[in-house]
């Protein structure tokens, strides 16, 4: 899928990620995305990974997670993401349960947790570290950094093997095992095949006609979450630019920097947005506060009491709504960072009625 999109879009930006040292968003083109996936796929062969084996990804959301995913799929491998906040004991359980041989880790926390578990995981052979700033344990003689891993695939020395494996790939192949967070007992693995994703993409192609390759999606939820993982695959399939938010706590900042048209999230995100707006209104006084309260009232009447049930709003109500749309609503959306919004899928729990009405 990535290689096909590279042929179509070339040097158009496919991914962006935030460089925390420079505070700049770094673009990755479709060509670079494809090239890195090919290199990583060759590197996996160089490591001796056999078809239909399990590899793990223990990291925050990073471009390397996607590089590794698609490189694995090219080799008919199964990727198993671990929550970035998993303890050493939780990581150990999943590594042993899935018999993971190679584990890709993000930053210092994940490396430390994984290395602590290493001696208790008999299948585990090597850690591959995304972040070059990670300090290795003095006892560690086997781990390598991701750039060293990619160097194993430089000039694509095993491309014939990769292409042979890709040719043998089937929708019946296992794509991921997604483990639950383990908050109510031992984590449980959910097996997802490629046909699961293919069918999800097929039906979304039919239903989400408003989604185009002009859209920009904020990757906010962890890629260990099936909602975000499937959504990101859909975005890649549709040629949507994906901007990767590394640290969940930073979303209020990054969403204002990117101002996405798309973002999947959970109700809790919108609850926080709603609470923030209510707090802002409470701090206002006089005419400004009265206008904000009236704008919310007008919006609810216009969209919920009339449009949602197929009625035409009265002219005066419609004119007030249009006025607020260019003033109060525009200000609130810009303050949040969603003024360019196309749509924002939300799942995981029911969204409270007052939040739905507000949004």
Positions of the model-derived regions?
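Conserved AMP-binding A3 loop
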Residues: 27-31, 168, 175-201
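Conserved ATP-dependent adenylate/AMP-binding module captured primarily in the ANL superfamily
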Residues: 86-119, 200-217, 248-262, 335-337
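Structural core segment of the AMP-binding/adenylate-forming
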Residues: 74-152
């Amino acid at each position: 899928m990535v290689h096909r999109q590279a042929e179509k879009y070339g040097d158009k930006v496919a991914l962006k990620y935030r460089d925390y040292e420079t505070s700049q968003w770094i673009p990755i083109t479709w060509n670079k995305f494809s090239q890195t996936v090919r290199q990583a796929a060759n590197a996996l062969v160089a490591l001796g990974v056999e078809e239909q084996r399990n590899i793990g990804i223990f990291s925050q959301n990073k471009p390397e997670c996607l590089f590794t995913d698609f490189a694995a799929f090219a080799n008919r491998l199964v990727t198993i993401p671990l929550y970035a906040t998993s303890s050493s004991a939780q990581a150990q359980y999943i590594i042993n349960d899935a018999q993971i041989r190679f584990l890709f880790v993000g930053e210092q926390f994940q490396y430390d947790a994984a290395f602590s578990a290493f001696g208790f995981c008999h299948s585990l052979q090597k850690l591959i570290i995304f972040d070059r700033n990670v300090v290795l344990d003095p006892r560690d003689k086997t781990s390598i950094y991701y750039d060293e891993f990619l160097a194993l695939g430089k000039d694509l020395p095993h491309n014939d093997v990769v292409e042979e494996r890709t040719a043998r790939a089937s929708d019946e192949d296992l794509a991921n095992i997604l483990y639950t967070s383990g908050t109510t007992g031992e984590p449980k693995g959910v097996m997802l095949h490629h046909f699961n994703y293919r069918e999800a993409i097929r039906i979304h192609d039919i239903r989400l006609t408003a989604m185009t390759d002009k859209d920009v999606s904020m990757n906010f939820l962890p890629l260990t979450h099936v909602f975000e993982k499937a959504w990101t695959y859909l975005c890649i399939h549709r040629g949507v630019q994906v901007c990767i938010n590394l640290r969940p706590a930073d979303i209020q900042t990054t969403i204002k920097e990117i101002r996405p048209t798309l973002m999947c999230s959970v109700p809790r995100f919108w609850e926080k947005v709603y609470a923030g707006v209510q707090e802002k209104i409470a701090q206002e006084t006089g005419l400004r506060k009265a206008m904000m309260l009236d704008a919310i009232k007008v919006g609810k009447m216009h969209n919920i009491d009339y449009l949602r049930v197929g009625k035409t709003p009265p002219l005066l109500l419609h004119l007030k709504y249009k006025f607020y749309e260019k003033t109060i609503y525009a200000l609130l959306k810009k303050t949040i960072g969603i003024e360019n919004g196309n749509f924002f899928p939300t799942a995981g729990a029911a969204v409270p009625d007052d939040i739905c009405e507000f949004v």
